A protein has these predicted regions:
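Glycan-recognition and catalytic cores of secretory/periplasmic carbohydrate-active enzymes
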Residues: 1-94
Length: 94
């Protein structure tokens, strides 16, 4: 999860520098890893607890929901939300 968060941040920063939409698409693709678009097709984010599983293993997901993984998931989500809010404000600006 930590690496996924780093990739989301890096992709959004690449968009901020280049303006190329492909970087936003890549950030969303990275975030979707938490939601089951991963090698095991298993969801790591648990909406009931608000936590995130600690990672993928050969035989499934690590059921622990550590603070580091949860923060990685939630901060990735906030990064995308902020990006979309910033873009909405830019479009609304005179």
């Amino acid at each position: 999860p930590i690496e996924t968060h780093a990739m989301v941040d890096a992709c959004i920063e690449a968009f901020n520098i280049s303006g190329e939409k492909k970087w936003v698409d890549n950030a969303v693709m990275c975030f979707n890893w938490f939601l089951g678009h991963n090698d095991l097709n298993m969801v790591l984010y648990d909406p009931k607890s608000g936590g995130c599983r600690d990672g993928l293993m050969a035989d499934g997901i690590n059921q622990n929901e550590g603070a580091e993984s949860t923060l990685a998931c939630l901060l990735s989500h906030l990064t995308l939300q902020k990006h979309y809010a910033d873009q909405t404000l830019k479009k609304a600006a005179p």
